[in-house]
């Protein structure tokens, strides 16, 4: 992707006076604060289920076509749980807590504190629904317990981030911290026992890993080690963390510290800010926790590099056409279930799911437009907001402000606009 230079602006993101421009269509909201109020209201009206877990998609009234307990047990539409409404609960809850907690810090309201705790309870539930220790589920069916047998590192990484954010927020009570610590310790022990792989239910055993020589893997593992040192007080975790920083490998052979310093890289698609943001969020936590000035500077460099790369995705928001009549369908069964077959390995489940999503996209083309032009630039905006360099943030305030103001959130079907709120709460008070 060609790098794009975004124009500077002398207007702050949160000032409410970003100019109306015609490039890429009219802006729906008069200011960013109004846009965020609507986004927040829609998230809580339609996308937070009865168990405090974000669902992936619903209709404009909030109706969700949930998989049944029987479908979850049978691995329908697929054993991964991909492309149905409870696909990404752990991921989205964990990441959205960044916004929920920053909102609470600003308002100190009981209502916002209650929303934070509701999201945390959702995360803890997803760690309590299986007999497999350390399992973090994606979401729950109508009975509040049935689930798909495989999670992933993309689910478990945000689970750690969200719980750490609450633990370190000043909102959590001592009793809540004790409870969080128990979940964190048990889950980490299970992951370590599997060689830093994520536990999954039979017949799969495991799926996804924090082990590997790549920015995303290296940073997630380092973050969990540092987190464990903080929440347990066990000095051996700090020692393991320090040793891990100097472990080298990959192509080219770099230390994990060097991978962190280099920032995120795209590797499985032209852009995938929406999944890479997990590691960038973990890197921000590492930057905040780290006291060694040299290492902290390296983490800041990784955050800067990630923000610069992510900013290239911001113009994608201009390609979303709200007037496009592309159909949304929540009927994933009619498209995906004709292809269903039993799966006994992770690869069989992946192959099935990839075929199914192509079929789903044919009856619900709105899925693709929101994924490409809402999900991706919104996640990119959050990545930019995580950068501690105010110069980088100021450079991209205009583009992020436009992104936030473009959309009528009451007309979006997928929850992945939530990242605009995470970005706004971090950037709204940045001086020009």
Each language-model region and where it sits:
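Elongated scaffolding segments in large macromolecular assemblies
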Residues: 174-311, 315-320
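Aromatic- and histidine-enriched alpha-helix N-cap/loop-to-helix transition segments
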Residues: 84-98, 150-161, 213-223, 271-282, ...
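N-terminal export signals
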Residues: 5-25
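Carbohydrate-binding/catalytic loop surfaces
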Residues: 53-85, 132-152, 200-220, 258-285, ...
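Low-complexity, Ser/Thr/Pro/Gly-enriched N-terminal "stalk/linker" regions
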Residues: 12, 25-88, 117-118, 122-139, ...
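Terminal, non-catalytic domain-edge segments
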Residues: 25-46, 171-173, 279-432
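Hydrophobic core segments within long, regular secondary-structure runs in both alpha-
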Residues: 32-44, 97, 113-127, 160, ...
């Amino acid at each position: 992707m060609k790098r794009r230079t975004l124009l500077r602006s002398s207007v702050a993101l949160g000032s409410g006076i970003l100019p109306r421009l015609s490039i890429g269509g009219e802006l729906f909201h008069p200011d960013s604060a109004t846009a965020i109020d609507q986004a927040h209201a829609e998230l809580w009206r339609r996308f937070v289920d009865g168990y405090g877990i974000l669902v992936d998609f619903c209709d404009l009234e909030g109706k969700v076509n949930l998989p049944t307990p029987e479908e979850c047990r049978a691995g329908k539409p697929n054993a991964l749980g991909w492309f149905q409404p409870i696909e990404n609960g752990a991921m989205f809850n964990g990441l959205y807590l960044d916004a929920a907690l920053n909102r609470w810090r600003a308002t100190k309201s009981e209502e916002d504190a209650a929303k934070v705790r509701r999201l945390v309870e959702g995360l803890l539930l997803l760690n309590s629904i299986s007999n497999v220790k350390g399992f973090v589920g994606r979401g729950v069916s109508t009975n509040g317990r049935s689930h798909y047998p495989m999670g992933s590192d993309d689910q478990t990484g945000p689970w750690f981030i969200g719980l750490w954010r609450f633990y370190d927020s000043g909102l959590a009570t001592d009793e809540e911290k004790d409870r969080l610590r128990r979940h964190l310790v048990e889950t980490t022990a299970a992951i370590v026992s599997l060689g830093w792989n994520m536990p999954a239910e039979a017949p799969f055993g495991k799926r996804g890993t924090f082990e590997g020589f790549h920015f995303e893997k290296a940073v997630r593992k380092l973050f969990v080690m540092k987190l464990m040192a903080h929440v347990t007080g066990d000095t051996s975790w700090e020692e393991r963390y320090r040793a891990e920083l100097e472990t080298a490998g990959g192509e080219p052979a770099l230390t994990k510290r060097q991978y962190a310093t280099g920032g995120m890289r795209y590797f499985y698609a032209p852009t995938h800010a929406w999944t890479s943001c997990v590691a960038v969020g973990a890197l921000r936590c590492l930057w905040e926790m780290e006291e060694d000035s040299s290492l902290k500077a390296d983490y800041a460099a990784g955050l800067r590099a990630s923000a610069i790369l992510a900013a290239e995705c911001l113009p994608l928001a201009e390609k979303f056409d709200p007037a496009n009549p592309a159909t949304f369908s929540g009927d994933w069964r009619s498209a995906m279930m004709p292809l269903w077959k039993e799966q006994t390995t992770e690869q069989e489940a992946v192959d099935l799911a990839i075929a199914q999503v192509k079929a789903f996209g044919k009856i619900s083309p709105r899925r693709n437009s929101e994924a490409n032009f809402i999900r991706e630039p919104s996640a990119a905006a959050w990545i930019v907001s995580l950068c501690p360099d105010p110069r980088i943030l100021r450079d991209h305030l205009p583009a992020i402000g436009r992104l936030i103001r473009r959309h009528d959130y009451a007309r979006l079907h997928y929850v992945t606009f939530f990242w605009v709120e995470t970005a706004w709460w971090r950037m709204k008070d940045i001086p020009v």
